[in-house]
Every structure is written in C-alpha cells, then in structure tokens.
A protein has these predicted regions:
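Short Lys/Arg-enriched helix C-cap and helix-to-coil transition segments
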Residues: 24-46
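The −1 position to Zn-ligating cysteines in a subset of zinc-ribbon hairpins
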Residues: 112, 125, 148
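Major-groove recognition helix of helix-turn-helix-like DNA-binding domains
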Residues: 7-23
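Charged, alpha-helical interface segments at or near domain boundaries
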Residues: 44-93
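A detector for short metal-coordination/catalytic motifs
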Residues: 100, 118-121, 130-219
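Short, charged surface segments at domain edges that flank catalytic/cofactor-binding sites
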Residues: 75-118, 130-143
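DNA-recognition alpha helix
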Residues: 1-6
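C-type cytochrome heme c attachment motif
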Residues: 8, 111-115, 151
Length: 219
C-alpha cells in the first residue's frame, strides 16, 4: 500500500494508528497515535465513523482507482452477495457496500463461523443482524454483522436462533419440537447456550442484537 500511495510503510502504519487512536474499542486497549495527530485526522474519523456506507463507497472507489482494477459482473457472482438488493437495481454503490461488508465481517472473525467455528470460506456468509432492508445506516456497518456458516446464517436470518445479552445462542421453541435428525440435533439443538466467538474488532452491536431478539427471533 505504501508503494501505491507514494509513502513509506512506516508512514502508512502510523497514519492508521492515528485513526485507531480515535476508536473507543482501541482506546480501551491503550492504542495511542502521534501526540500531534492533526485535526484533519479527527475530522475524517468523525465524518466516516457515523456514515459507514459513505466510507465504504468512497474507500472502495479510491482503492480501485489506485490499483487499476475493475469489478466485473462475473467476478461479483463468484462472491456470495448475501443481502438482497432492495432498490430494484444493482448499482455500483450497492455492490461496493456489499463487498466491503462481507470482507470486513468475515476477516474480523478470522473467516470462521462464530457459532460452530467452521472455517471453510466457501461456506460462510456475512449475516446482517438488523436486516439489510430495515436500516440503511446499518447496511455497511461491520458491527451489524456476524460471520456464520450457511446453516446458522439461514437459521439466524429466519429467526430460528438469536443471541442473548451475553452473546449466548438462544434457540426458538419451534426448533425444539420438530422431528429431530442428526444434523438438527448437532447443528441446532446442541448449540443452545453456547457463547459465540467474538472478534477482536467490530464486536456485534448490542442494540442490533436487541433488535434481532425483538423483531426477528421467532421466540
């Protein structure tokens, strides 16, 4: 990245540390930037921290300009663009937001399911906690995401499972009354009460999980 930007690797690293020093999660870890971190860095942080979609769109476009890459429809189909597009048309903005969200969420969880720890990337989805269609401001926010395998993504999306305030899996009552197959028992019944694996960054937003429990979970 430093070579592309015309900066030394150490200069790029320190700039990123400056931004990290504004992040409450990193401040708890005592991450500190330069003592003279400029007001410009703070202004950029404040602007984009409250607008994940804007940050995503501008940063992804900037990266493509720097790297000279162009996304094709074929390339995008190879990626699992999990959320449904509600605008009726796949605009460039939507594609970039979806791509950023998926990569940010999955990388935060080390490319493994936060429930069962399956680590086959082809079997993973970046699941929105508050559904894509319900809150535009949350669409690109990685804290509104969980890395889930295909089974648990589907169950979470349909309200068959959720997480409590302590990040433990809760299974809907209906799931417990259905005829039990081996997969049903291992994949759903036995995960109840299990604490999900939390990421080092972009920890799931507590208010988003509360929304899921109240509005999505089947109870």
């Amino acid at each position: 990245m430093g070579e592309v930007l015309g900066r030394t690797p150490s200069a790029v690293a320190m700039k990123l540390v400056n931004f990290a020093s504004f992040d409450p999660a990193h401040r708890e870890r005592n991450v500190k930037g330069l003592a003279n971190a400029g007001k410009g860095d703070r202004a950029i942080w404040d602007e984009f921290h409250s607008d994940w979609e804007g940050l995503t769109f501008e940063s992804e476009q900037a990266w493509e300009r720097l790297m000279g890459t162009v996304r094709t429809e074929e390339t995008e189909r190879e990626e699992d663009d999990r959320p449904a597009v509600t605008e009726g048309e796949r605009t460039v903005r939507v594609r970039l937001v979806q791509r950023f969200f998926r990569e940010a969420v999955l990388s935060s969880y080390g490319y493994s399911c936060c429930i069962c720890e399956l680590n086959l990337a082809e079997m993973l989805n970046a699941s929105h906690i508050i559904p894509w269609s319900k809150d535009e401001k949350k669409r690109a926010d990685p804290r509104n995401g969980l890395s889930l395998c295909a089974l648990h993504d589907r169950a979470f999306d349909r309200g068959l499972i959720t997480m409590d305030e302590k990040y433990r899996v809760v299974v809907a009552g209906r799931v417990k009354t259905e005829n039990v197959s081996e997969l049903h028992e291992v994949g759903l019944l036995k995960i109840e009460g299990r604490r999900i694996v939390l990421p080092e960054r972009f920890r799931p937003d507590a208010e988003a999980l509360e929304y899921h429990r109240e509005k999505v979970f089947a109870g």
